[in-house]
């Protein structure tokens, strides 16, 4: 069959069918997303061949899709290694014990949200926040008997806030660059949607965090088990300080993680001078295996290792293969282009831009593309009606990068689920910050409150 340009109707049908397959498989039947995503890749490949696309076209689409994830995949592998050595060296157990002594049960969940927000702004990486301080706070919550999904929601909400508002964040810099807005003006302008989202999220975490029962006996028992089996000290916080220094010095993620793993390995050898190279290799590859007298502590701290990230890596490769093919065959672009012609009102334009970012997260699963594609598609429309580039860059964050954590087959969502051990569909209702950000952004667009216009229109 001769290859022809994909029509709008055809694009919409394909996107609806693919989303239906993924949604029914993951949500209705509770399947792990890896196989349904691979099945959609197979279906799209079959359609592409029927439409006249060559195997080379298909392979190029897959390669282009996966290409954007090579660095994140490498970072995920390093984070897996970091989690294992951090537990072995007593870093995560030390944070847990210190947390037991410093955070009251009644204000625990809001405290998790606030701490992860602060760390996220300082580090500029939601992934690193979740996989380090986030895991320690999750452990504290488990020991307190808090709802795991609620605690995970607070951790992710704080990490997303920090990632969104940090000048060190990749996604923040990307949104600013795509919209051609000045970085710090962009961060300042985001407060119109970010502050209300943060405030409402904090209230909801406080209300829901007080609804559970905290068991002080279990907390004391867990603290004692940790102190009996790990080296608990303030020195264990040294790798965290190193991470903050690297963020302040704007050192990229990969060398930061390498340095952190190296200094943690040195700490392990100081604590256990006779540690063999074989056991260290096994720790980095397969993670830490806790063997304490408490089964709940063992379940909580048996994690990490490069191998623990392989399921996430497989999902990312499959999802981005699908996304790359959708882009290569112009399916996503052809579905977006007609929308631009009819958007001459700020409220309508902002709403459609946010919905487009959400849809790209659903179909492509990659947060950077959920910023880049709507940014390129709708920038002329923002310019045409006189909106400032700051309006566009804020919308790209609110509908793009913050949403990826809510997608079971998304890069960020699958990573958070793997790191915390809570499925996306369980923590999704509690990631209030990500859920509220697009709502307040649309409200701003419809009402005009906090909406930034180009200077020539003012």
Provide a role label for each language-model segment.
Residues 1-4, 87-97, 114-118, 213-227, ...:
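Short juxtamembrane and helix-loop transition motifs at transmembrane-helix boundaries
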Residues 1-72, 194-196, 200, 209-315, ...:
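Hydrophobic transmembrane alpha-helices of multi-pass small-molecule transporters
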Residues 6, 12, 178-194, 198, ...:
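C-terminal transmembrane helix pair
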Residues 19-24, 45-46, 114-118, 139-140, ...:
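Alpha-helical transmembrane segments of multipass membrane proteins
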Residues 52-142, 293-379:
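Membrane-embedded alpha-helical segments and adjacent helix-loop junctions characteristic
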Residues 127, 159-174, 372-381:
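Short helical (or helix-break) motifs at transmembrane helix termini and adjacent helical loops
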Residues 132-138, 155, 256-266:
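Central hydrophobic cores of alpha-helical transmembrane segments
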Residues 154-155, 160-163, 167-168, 198-214, ...:
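Transmembrane-helix bundle segments that line or gate the permeation/cavity pathway
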């Amino acid at each position: 069959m001769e290859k022809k340009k994909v029509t709008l109707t055809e694009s919409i049908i394909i996107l609806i069918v693919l989303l239906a397959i993924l949604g029914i498989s993951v949500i209705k039947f509770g399947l792990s997303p890896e196989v349904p995503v691979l099945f959609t890749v197979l279906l799209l490949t079959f359609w592409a061949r029927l439409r006249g696309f060559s195997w080379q076209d298909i392979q190029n689409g897959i390669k282009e899709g996966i290409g954007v994830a090579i660095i994140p995949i490498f970072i995920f592998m390093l984070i897996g290694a970091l989690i294992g050595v951090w537990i072995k060296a007593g870093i995560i157990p030390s944070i847990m014990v210190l947390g037991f002594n410093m955070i009251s049960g009644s204000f625990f969940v809001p405290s998790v949200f606030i701490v992860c927000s602060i760390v996220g702004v300082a580090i500029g990486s939601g992934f690193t926040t979740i996989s380090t301080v986030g895991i320690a706070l999750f452990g504290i919550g488990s020991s307190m008997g808090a709802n795991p999904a609620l605690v995970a929601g607070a951790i992710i909400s704080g990490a997303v806030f920090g990632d969104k508002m940090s000048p060190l964040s990749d996604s923040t810099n990307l949104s600013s660059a795509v919209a051609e807005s000045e970085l710090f003006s962009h961060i300042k302008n985001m407060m119109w949607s970010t502050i209300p989202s943060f405030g409402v999220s904090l209230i909801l975490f406080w209300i829901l965090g007080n609804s559970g029962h905290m068991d002080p006996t279990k907390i004391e028992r867990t603290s004692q088990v940790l102190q009996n089996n790990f080296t608990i000290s303030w020195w264990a916080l040294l790798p965290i300080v190193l991470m903050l220094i690297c963020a302040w010095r704007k050192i990229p993620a990969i060398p930061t993680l390498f340095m952190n793993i190296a200094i943690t390995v040195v700490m392990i050898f100081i604590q256990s001078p006779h540690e063999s190279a074989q056991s260290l290799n096994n720790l980095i590859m397969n993670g830490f295996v806790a063997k304490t007298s408490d089964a709940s502590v063992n379940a909580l701290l048996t994690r990490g290792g490069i191998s623990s990230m392989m399921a996430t890596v497989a999902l990312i490769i499959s999802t981005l293969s699908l996304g790359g093919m959708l882009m290569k065959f112009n399916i996503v672009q052809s579905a977006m282009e007609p929308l631009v012609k009819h958007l001459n009102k700020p409220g309508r334009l902002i709403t459609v831009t946010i919905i487009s970012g959400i849809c790209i997260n659903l179909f492509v699963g990659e947060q950077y593309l959920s910023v880049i594609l709507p940014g390129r598609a709708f920038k002329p429309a923002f310019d045409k009606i006189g909106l400032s580039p700051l309006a566009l860059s804020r919308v790209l964050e609110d509908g793009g990068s913050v949403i990826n954590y809510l997608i079971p087959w998304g890069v960020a969502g699958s990573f958070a689920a793997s790191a915390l051990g809570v499925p996306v569909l369980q923590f999704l209702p509690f990631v209030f910050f990500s859920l509220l950000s697009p709502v307040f952004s649309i409200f701003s667009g419809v009402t005009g409150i906090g909406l930034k216009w180009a200077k020539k229109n003012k």
